[in-house]
Design a protein with these regions (language model features):
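Cell wall/extracellular polymer interaction/catalysis modules
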Residues: 1-27
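Exported/periplasmic cell-wall-interacting domains
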Residues: 22-29, 34-134
Length: 134
């Protein structure tokens, strides 16, 4: 969900980090660090082109995922991302147009999750909080 001045701007199903592979998304309170159009997101074994990228915790951010046909429910448990928040392309465009740098991001899991992957440990809420003072 994205609320501005108490009103719902947009909502959508998402796909967060794949917890079965230890790539859970960081949970905590963050802010949009910057916005970038036409980015290539690069990891150890992938490179994904996205139209709209809005990072909030180091290299973890909200972006379109044109390669996905479904979003929401429990996809993240077995077919999630490398940690980013995947949203449908039309919703990513709407968010990109309406979010401002500095907009708060509240990320959480509904059930307890143990994050174990090295890249998740590096990008977790504690390290981000320590560096940014959030």
């Amino acid at each position: 969900w994205y609320y501005k001045d108490g009103s719902l701007v947009t909502d959508t199903g998402i796909v967060s980090g794949n917890i079965s592979r230890g790539n859970g998304s960081p949970d905590g309170i963050f802010k949009i660090a910057y916005k970038q159009k036409d980015a290539t997101l690069v990891g150890e074994n992938y490179a994904s082109d996205v139209r709209y990228f809005m990072p909030f915790a180091y290299n973890v951010g909200i972006h379109d995922a044109s390669w996905r046909s479904t979003f929401g429910k429990e996809i993240y448990k077995t077919s999630g991302s490398h940690g980013c928040i995947n949203v449908p392309p039309k919703k990513a465009k709407k968010l990109f147009q309406t979010l401002q740098v500095g907009t708060p991001v509240i990320a959480y899991y509904r059930e307890p999750v143990t994050l174990t992957a090295e890249n998740t440990r590096i990008s977790n809420a504690y390290s981000y909080k320590a560096e940014t003072g959030l």
